[in-house]
UniProtKB/Swiss-Prot annotation:
The keyword Translocase does not apply. It is found in: Cell inner membrane. Keywords: Cell inner membrane, Cell membrane, Membrane, Transmembrane, Transmembrane helix. The gene is ydcZ. This is Inner membrane protein YdcZ. Residues 26-33, 92-93, 145-149 are cytoplasmic. GO terms for cellular component: plasma membrane. Residues 1-4, 55-70, 115-123 are periplasmic. The keyword Transmembrane helix applies. The chain crosses the membrane at residues 5-25, 34-54, 71-91, 94-114, 124-144. It is a multi-pass membrane protein. InterPro entries: YdcZ (IPR006750). GO terms for biological process: bacterial-type flagellum-dependent swarming motility; inorganic cation import across plasma membrane.
Amino acid sequence: MNQSLTLAFLIAAGIGLVVQNTLMVRITQTSSTILIAMLLNSLVGIVLFVSILWFKQGMAGFGELVSSVRWWTLIPGLLGSFFVFASISGYQNVGAATTIAVLVASQLIGGLMLDIFRSHGVPLRALFGPICGAILLVVGAWLVARRSF
């Protein structure tokens, strides 16, 4: 996939996330628990991915799925569910902009730390730009979020 298409997908996913969370908040407003919205979200994804796996690989795909399960392979699903829960809660309690600002800033810091940890021997000079960018993003997130906390 070329860089332009990747950028377009990332932008579409970012906008889609705002729409998704807004709709999920609406579901929680007509439900007794946030779990209804989360389960509907997961159910749609499961049906979609099961259908694609069946279409592409048939029963062999399900055999591979079962053989791929390890205890640690369940962690991304738990973290994804936590992310969805935190996002919906954030939209409900502090609004979309604050939620997005805090999530993006914390993701950038975590990603930058991971990149620094993985990049053995990278000169400090090469990290100056990314670190300054992260600081500016955190300051921007604080400016957006300070009214909510």
